[in-house]
């Protein structure tokens, strides 16, 4: 997959396994391990220094001779909660402020009950104010098995 960035001006991103839902059953590959594997197969690569590529948590590498970049989104091995600017709206209208936790707000109910734009905005701002400081993905399964953690799979959440 990484070789696709060699011949195309496309940035290939690897997303670390998120231990939520069914993802808890699998062992993910850390960014360091993937860098080691890629280092055996690819020409020399180095951290990308330049204009930001997008506005998310991905960090990129330049690879000699490649048209595109190789990037990593590593929520477990390189926790980026302090810089997280993401929220997620599920197809059921539920606003999630962190993928690990089941907490959030039911925006569908606000809309269906006739809530005004101002009410909807207030509910969203309230959810954002309660956005957790971080996740406990690396903290062991005992921290992930309480009733506050997400039980749904990424496909059900929208990822």
Where are these regions (language model features)?
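Radical SAM enzyme [4Fe-4S]-AdoMet core and its adjacent flexible, acidic
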Residues: 1-69, 75, 109-111
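Short capping micro-motif at the N-terminus of alpha-helices
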Residues: 70-72, 97-98
